[in-house]
């Protein structure tokens, strides 16, 4: 990152670059971007409003609406050409709201009609904005059938289009709009095709929550305009938006250093170490997994096994309680140690908290780990100890500036991997409050503790104390089972031991962890019934495919 001030960085957002200012009718085919493996910037409503206002000043009237509707139509036409979803002259049914989202929908209907595709519009109330009125005139001139009530059944339509409300919705869907949202969502839930324009109606595009806890449309596909939005990838947004495609509409925004990104391999892959022939086990670091009080040995072993398969050179398990096994039969490569037998400060990285409990042994082990000048991952019970113990919390925060930390401390802040309840304890709020602003909560924790935060959940957020943040697009409900968090901790710990910077280690860990779940689910091992132990071998394969492809 550069050393510009926050004000200077944020000022980048108000200077959009415009494509050639030509009338909408002569625009080329719309550019549609798939977010897959792209570190796209994720824009808030406020940022997009600034972009849209400035961009519209340099364009002929109605151009952005014309481009948005054309992008939606182009997406439908391309999809239908590949999957036959409009075969047999099945028409498209379009729900248009009173604002600019409804105007986008009307333009889409006009473009479909001009392309010879039957389209019908349901417009429950009259449109209210100047741009939308223009779009209505164009649709009527093109002969688009427009009614004020929906048909008795939507089953005859090839696609349904949600153009009710976009990012400007500030209150829950009510009345006829709520009824339409239910009907449209029912179609998506029964394997029908639903396209949302910009965002599913009723979704808060900043947070991924439903607006004020109300209803929201469930879509199978979303074409989002100008730029991607964080709410499409977090909490309910992932279920409601379906497959997301970005239509920039010819406006390109220079990206500030601290803008939120969609996590992608280009953000972390360059930081992996080379695997030269002249390497040995010490080259790729020694990790100690610290945890496993009496009766809780499984969690650290899961983490340690994952660390082995994520490329760490040597992996130790430092148990803190009695009764630990002498070795791990499936993985005798792991080195298991009874309490107090391993010199933690001799390790290249530590992963602390798995199966640790909250007793005296756990507090002592965490305090010892915090005093070690090595990269440190903190998970599970260790996070709960920090939340309940002011001295431990202050010690963690002090590591960010303490002289006792490694010389490269800014490169290797601690990594904390809380789930929402653990994060809420650290912030002294409720989990519900935290979930209302996952990005803000993760950034607040990063600032409070001078640490990289991995806020787990649907759309895991990774936030750095230097202001960088990303939302992870991989993973699915298969990860909602015991032990998967331990596996994630082991993966990130292994990457810290291999000397990846903390932020990039966290990005890589959550991406690979989620990708492994996606891969297993696609192969039939999920989303129901996947076990944590299945993830690590798949992570190994994906890591080698992505970072270390075979030599010719």
Where are these regions (language model features)?
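Small-residue (G/A/S/T)-rich helix-start motifs and N-terminal tracts that mark the onset
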Residues: 4, 11-124, 217-221, 227-380, ...
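Generic detection of intrinsically disordered/low-complexity segments and helix-coil linkers/edges
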Residues: 7, 11, 151-153, 159, ...
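N-terminal small/polar loop signature for handling phosphorylated ligands or for N-terminal nucleophile
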Residues: 107-188, 325-343
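Internal gly/pro-rich beta-alpha loop/helix module
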Residues: 159, 164-258
């Amino acid at each position: 990152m550069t050393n510009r001030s926050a004000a200077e960085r944020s000022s980048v957002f108000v200077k959009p670059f415009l494509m050639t200012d030509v009338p909408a009718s002569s625009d080329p085919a719309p550019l549609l971007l798939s977010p897959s493996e792209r570190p796209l910037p994720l824009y808030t409503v406020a940022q997009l409003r600034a972009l849209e206002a400035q961009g519209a000043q340099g364009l002929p009237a109605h151009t952005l609406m014309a481009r948005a509707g054309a992008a939606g139509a182009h997406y439908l036409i391309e999809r239908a050409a590949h999957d036959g979803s409009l075969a047999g002259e099945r028409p498209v049914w379009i729900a248009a709201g009173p604002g600019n989202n409804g105007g986008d929908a009307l333009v889409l209907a006009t473009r479909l009609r001009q392309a010879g595709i039957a389209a019908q519009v349901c417009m429950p109330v009259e449109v209210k904005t100047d741009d939308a009125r223009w779009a209505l005139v164009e649709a009527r001139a093109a002969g688009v059938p427009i009614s004020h009530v929906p048909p008795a059944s939507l089953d005859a339509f090839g696609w349904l289009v949600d153009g009710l409300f976009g990012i400007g919705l500030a209150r829950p869907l009510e009345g006829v709009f709520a009824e339409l949202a239910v009907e449209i969502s029912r179609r998506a839930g029964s394997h029908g095709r639903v396209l949302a324009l910009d965002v599913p109606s009723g979704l808060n595009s900043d947070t991924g929550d439903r607006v004020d806890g109300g209803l929201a449309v469930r879509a199978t596909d979303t074409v989002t305009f100008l730029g991607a939005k964080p709410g499409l990838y977090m909490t309910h947004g992932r279920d409601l938006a379906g497959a997301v495609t970005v239509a920039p509409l010819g406006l390109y925004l220079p990206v500030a250093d601290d803008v939120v990104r969609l996590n992608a391999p280009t953000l972390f892959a360059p930081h992996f170490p080379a695997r030269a022939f002249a390497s040995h086990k010490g080259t790729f670091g020694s990790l100690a997994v610290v945890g496993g009080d009496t009766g809780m040995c499984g969690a650290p072993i899961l983490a340690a096994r994952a660390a082995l398969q994520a490329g760490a050179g040597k992996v130790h398990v430092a148990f803190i309680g009695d009764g630990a096994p002498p070795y791990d039969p499936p993985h005798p490569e792991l080195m298991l140690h009874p309490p107090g037998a391993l010199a933690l400060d001799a390790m290249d990285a530590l992963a602390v908290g798995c199966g640790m409990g909250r007793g005296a042994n756990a507090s002592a082990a965490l305090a010892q780990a915090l005093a070690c000048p090595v990269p440190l991952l903190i998970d599970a019970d260790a996070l709960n100890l920090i939340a309940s113990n002011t001295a431990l919390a202050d010690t963690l925060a002090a590591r960010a500036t303490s002289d006792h930390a490694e010389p490269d401390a800014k490169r290797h802040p601690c990594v904390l991997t809380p789930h929402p309840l653990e994060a809420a304890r650290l912030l002294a709020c409720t989990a519900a409050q935290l979930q209302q602003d996952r990005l803000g909560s993760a950034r607040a924790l990063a600032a409070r503790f001078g640490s990289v935060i991995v806020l787990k959940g649907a759309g895991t957020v990774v936030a750095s104390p230097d202001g960088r943040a990303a939302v992870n697009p991989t993973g699915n409900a298969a990860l909602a089972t015991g032990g998967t968090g331990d596996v994630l901790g082991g993966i990130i710990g292994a990457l810290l031991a291999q000397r990846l910077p903390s932020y990039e280690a966290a990005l890589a860990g959550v991406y690979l962890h989620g990708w492994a779940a996606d891969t297993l689910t696609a192969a039939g091992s999920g989303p129901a019934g996947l076990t944590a132990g299945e993830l690590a071998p798949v992570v190994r394969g994906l890591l080698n495919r992505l970072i270390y492809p075979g030599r010719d």
